[in-house]
């Protein structure tokens, strides 16, 4: 019973700042997982690319969010078309969202260096709530948990991605349709499971500080109807094109955090990374922080790639 109550508390607390708007999960290493929020990114690395990520948020709090993502994308032979597929599994207490989406992009050259890509994303979102909480006698009659169910719902997303080898700017809405996951959706309950449209703006630049050192700042702005505005800033240094070291800061009404990021280019095809976040809210009394690991791989089939890809 104690375990149930702890999970129930984190479930309610987390959704109190989400409000009625279910958001896509947030990532410290968002700049390396762009395909999950912007379909126009598909194929931009000019080779077959994959990203796997695991995030354990607010470690030490039972029922805190955990997220896994897996994505693969590649350009087609004519270079202008990119395709990909992405999967996200996001669990929060007794609540689980799974996203399975395909990505398509079309790229237009903008001069000698810049490229502008248009993207569309389509697929399904599954909403699931653990029956354990619904069957427990202490909450079975609580209207807070009425009208929730397991269901699959279709959705689509759109994106723009303007980039060169030195900088990028992106705009996207990975879920365009507002989805009600409650049975009936009659508005008679205090909590409703709704997936609201989120808007993302991203950007980054690579500065050459010396022959062996590069500096890459990046930003992400996320706006969701019914949820606090979120702004992420990161600053990474790259040494000898092998080792990344940097930090991050998230400005958010309820989930501000300070982070540390490190990555290692193990080989031309393989890169691994780790990020740690410390919450700058009252949550830091109950958690040791957030941990995130990422694995990136690429299969080089083309002799056309002439410079390293920094994002």
Task: Name each model feature, range by range.
Residues 1-7, 110-112:
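Positively charged n-region of N-terminal signal peptides that target proteins for export
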């Amino acid at each position: 019973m104690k375990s149930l109550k702890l999970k129930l508390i984190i479930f309610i607390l987390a959704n109190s700042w989400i409000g009625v708007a279910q958001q896509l999960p947030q990532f410290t290493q968002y700049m390396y997982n762009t395909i999950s929020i912007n379909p126009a990114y598909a194929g931009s690395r000019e080779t077959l690319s994959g990203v796997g990520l695991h995030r354990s948020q607010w470690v030490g709090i039972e029922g805190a969010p955990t997220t896994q993502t897996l994505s693969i994308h590649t350009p087609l032979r004519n270079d202008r078309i990119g395709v990909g597929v992405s999967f996200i599994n996001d669990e929060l207490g007794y609540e689980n969202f799974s996203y399975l989406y395909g990505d398509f992009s079309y790229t237009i050259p903008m001069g000698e260096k810049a490229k502008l890509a248009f993207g569309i994303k389509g697929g399904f979102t599954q909403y699931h709530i653990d029956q354990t909480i619904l069957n427990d006698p202490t909450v079975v009659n609580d209207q807070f948990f009425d009208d929730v169910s397991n269901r699959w719902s279709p959705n689509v997303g759109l994106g723009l991605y303007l980039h060169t080898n030195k900088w990028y700017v992106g705009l996207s809405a990975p879920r365009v349709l507002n989805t009600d996951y409650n049975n009936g959706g009659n508005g008679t309950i205090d909590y409703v499971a709704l997936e609201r449209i989120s808007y993302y703006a991203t950007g980054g630049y690579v500065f050459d500080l010396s022959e062996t050192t590069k500096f890459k700042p990046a930003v992400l702005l996320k706006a969701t109807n019914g949820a606090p505005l979120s702004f992420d800033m990161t600053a990474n240094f790259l040494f000898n094109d092998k080792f990344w070291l940097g930090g991050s800061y998230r400005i958010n009404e309820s989930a501000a955090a300070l982070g540390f990021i490190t990555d290692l280019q193990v080989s031309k095809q393989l890169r691994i990374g780790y990020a740690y976040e410390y919450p700058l809210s009252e949550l830091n009394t109950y958690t040791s922080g957030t941990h995130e690991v990422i694995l990136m791989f690429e299969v080089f089939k083309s002799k056309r790639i002439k410079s390293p890809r920094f994002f």
